[in-house]
Amino acid sequence: MAFLEDGNHTTVTEFFLLGLTDDPVLRDILFIIILCIYLVTVSGNLSTILLIRVSSQLHHPMYFILSHLASVDIGISSSVTPNMLATFLVKQNTISYIGCSIQFTSAAFFGTVECFLLATMAYDRFVAICNPLLYSTKMSTEACIQLVVGSYIQGFLNASFFTLSFFSLFFCGPNRINDFYCDFAPLLELSCSDVTVAVVITSISAGFITLTTVFVIAISYSCIFITIMKMHSTESRCKAFSTCTSHLTAVILFYGTAIFIYVMPKSSYSTDQNKVLSIFYTVVIPMLNPLIYSLRNNEIKEALKRHLGKKVFSYGNLFCKTHYNHNYPV
């Protein structure tokens, strides 16, 4: 039941997601592609977390933050992808009122945390390159924990603002959302009540997060580039810059896509283009992050080789012992 009679009012109890396409063949193809991406996302980020936990050489502030970034990437993808895959299977694109609020609230929470973690990693690179002698003090274990906890608190606050704004709205008419998941902007268009307060509150919250994190990232990298340009040897410049390329790539992908979705005027691109960008933002980027950080980071690659080598060596020893005992019993 999509509507509930409440006295003289009709209340929406569920929303209908128009999804990505109506073509049944294309839906099946998209299901397979997105399922594969989701499996790679979860396995890749879990592998990153486990590798950082078990590798003593990766027990540094940057990798501590990276492990939380990997957890958040799983959260962002999981807030949208499982429900989207389910709609592909059951051919039923409805989501309950509460389910809709949970979906966009979790997306807002994890998206906010990712913004602050990316800003924290930029600050980490700034201290490492511009103030290396103070690195152990400014990026101590206690400082890292405080920065990460602060990121989660900001995520909780922003998600709370969006949740309270959502429950202050009244839905009595159309319930069709032209998207594949419950985003806050399309919900505002469906509301029968005045959305001014909700728009102001969420805009201030999202604006504060965006401006704060972009400011920290911009200032950090400005100082980093100035410091790198002052280095005398080309080798030192390349080495310093190589420590930033992975993070800078992740920042450009994340914020670049977010700007197109939430900042650019809707008239500048079509709804279908917006859906593609949203897929990239919520599904593809969480898969790319572990690849970006692992393929361009020598310490992670060395740790991965070392642990894979140990596994191969231990399995080889086990095979040899089994083979020896089988052929030459005592």
UniProtKB/Swiss-Prot annotation:
Cysteine pairings via disulfide bonds: 100-192
Glycan attachment residues as annotated in the record: 8
Gene Ontology CC terms, in alphabetical order: membrane; plasma membrane
Molecular function GO labels: G protein-coupled receptor activity; olfactory receptor activity
One GO BP: G protein-coupled receptor signaling pathway
Keywords for the protein's UniProt record, in alphabetical order: Cell membrane, Disulfide bond, G-protein coupled receptor, Glycoprotein, Membrane, Olfaction, Receptor, Sensory transduction, Transducer, Transmembrane, Transmembrane helix
Membrane protein topology class: Multi-pass membrane protein
Cytoplasmic side: 50-57, 124-136, 221-240, 296-330
InterPro entries associated with the record: GPCR_Rhodpsn, GPCR_Rhodpsn_7TM, Olfact_rcpt
Taxonomy, superkingdom: Eukaryota
Cell compartment(s), UniProt: Cell membrane
Xref: Pfam families: 7tm_4
Glycosyltransferase recorded as keyword: no
Major location (coarse): membrane
Transmembrane parts of this sequence: 29-49, 58-78, 103-123, 137-157, 200-220, 241-261, 275-295
Record topology, Extracellular segments: 1-28, 79-102, 158-199, 262-274
Function statement: Potential odorant receptor.
Similarity-based family: Belongs to the G-protein coupled receptor 1 family.
PANTHER family to which the protein is assigned, alphabetical: OLFACTORY RECEPTOR
Name of the featured protein: Olfactory receptor 5P73
Organism (species): Mus musculus
